[in-house]
Amino acid sequence: MRVFLFYISFILLLFSLESCYKEEVIFNVEANNFLELPLILRINNKDCAFDYSQNTLRYPIEKDSIINFEAFIEFQGYSEVIFNNHSLKNNLINNLGEIRTNKQYEIKISTNNTAKVLKLRFTNLPIVQLITASRIYDEPKSLARFVINFPNQNTISSYVGIEQRGGWATLQLPKKSYSFSFLNSTFLDEKTPYSVFDLEQNTDWVLDGMYTDNTRLRNKIASNIWKAIPGEKHYGISPNFVELYLNNEHQGLYCLSENINAELLLLLNEDALLYKAIGWTGPDCFETSSDDLPSIERWDGWVQKYPNPNQRINWKPLADLRNLIVESSDEDFILQIGTFIDIDNFIDYYLFLNLICAKDNLAKNIFLTKQSLIDRFTIIPWDFDNSFGSSGIQPIVNNNLYKRLSELNPNNFNKRLKDRWIFLRIEAFKESNLLSIIKKSSNQIQKSNIIEIENEKWATIINLETEHANLMLWIVDRLNTMDNYYQNL
């Protein structure tokens, strides 16, 4: 009898606790064991993202406005939800009337005698939610759930291993950038390739915070310009704007893109190579050479990204290139440089980095790759924060490789450089095309109030209209500078 009474009392206690819990909706709670947050409001099978400090909800839509927006609505079953003074029906299609981006709507959620008023805004940008039970560090990676709600595609949800991204200076910024890998389980070593934004599948991805770029455009438009140059070997990333939430905190505007790795470049040959320059030092600028080759993944300001350093280290092809550039006689340089590098690719790279004044990309912000040992090196740019006049108007820039190419003129380098500039000015570098690339990206992030959120979250005073207008004036002026230079080459 006592045992029976004990169980009855225990059940009543649980019921009482559950009833107390249902007296109000708990908003800012930790994720469950599956790294999921509790339901607040779901529209057409996509959870609205919630910011606890601002009491706001956000939801992505494809168009700037929708008349008679009919949507399947879900919320916690013991609550009442009022949208714009209209009571919503749970687990049914509701007509929300006309909705538009950049307009605030009131949501009132009531449970018994408690109520909370939230502000709902619609955005044209995809929304990424990172849900984690632990802090995200520089390294090692932490486990998180990655959820992305698109305006016009199905939701993607997956476990990821995530860490902060960048060098020492970047890691000190208040707004963090992240690198992450998709996982097929909760084990951090079980990586799996994934496709986002209909891009090719990749295991490794980047969320770029763009904190030091007041235009919030430089990396995206530079990548678009580089990939618009006609040619077979213009490898690069395809950044896409997203809004990022870390649990229940809006982090602002980010660019989501693939990482430059063997998957992106389709490096299948066991003799393929991928090196990444990581420092503004003599070796990176091809100012010095060395035959002291280590058996580790880092050497003289470079990192071997492929082959996997745990399996094989191969610095000799890079050492041979450096020795040719730094140590060779003029005659040997003229005869051999065309067998070491893809001249056409390096010409396009030189024109591109001078067009956008990407001085950093002379050294640390580059990748060198080749598909096999008999192939020639091609060059890949990345990270364009310091470009498009961010350091003021700059003259035509060089490193030691380009100085020797210009001075010694192997393979008729200077004429090919000038002819290529004239050709690219017809289409890829046409003023209207470059301005169109800027305007398209600018329009994407000015349709919603995302910069207001950025300014409030990170205590900045960015005016996108002014920044983007100045950027377009700068590119027009830069084209004139480049035209004058190549006319006299």
Model-derived segments and their meaning:
Residues 21-125:
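Beta-rich interaction/scaffold domains
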Residues 1-4:
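Positively charged n-region of N-terminal signal peptides that target proteins for export
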Residues 79-81, 229-243, 358:
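Short, well-structured beta-strand/strand-turn elements
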